[in-house]
């Protein structure tokens, strides 16, 4: 409920004729909120299809050469919490490796206006394209992000043999099924918790204890299911909603 996009989600849930969910967790949430069971279906996440379709371009990206980064010797971070910049500096100090910060323009302005000095090992970079960003993720020492898609990306790359330590800077998640499988760590939003989470994720990755891919995140026929559900339900919606 504390996520800013939750208001939009709830509006869409109510006005949609059919709700297509990523998991049984999501379906139960919708049903508990009052959405009719006959209007909810589990299709899985489309992320695996998207990543698989683009995998060759992701793997052939030259982003490491362009940024002068050595694979497995940097930490990829994407965050918007000013209070955590000190933790980013602490990561640079502790691991003594480049911290690549994919920085949104608004975050850059906030950082500049605050006068906070980032460690010299922290590399600020404009938001990256899809191929470059995922190439960096799959080869990073660790990935620290507040993105809601991190669990899906971590699950997919684990399923294709490229697991990476995934740490999410949030106090809650709409992806509980990913926590069920241990595919990422929820770090909270304070510096101490973040460092502990990174340590945990990195150590478990070293021990090849990366968690298990979430089945709903590795399903590669999601688009086919969506098309068939829409086709199947169009007549029902026309009759029951639009009275055609």
Task: List PLM regions with ranges.
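A conserved, positively charged/aromatic
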Residues: 1-17, 137
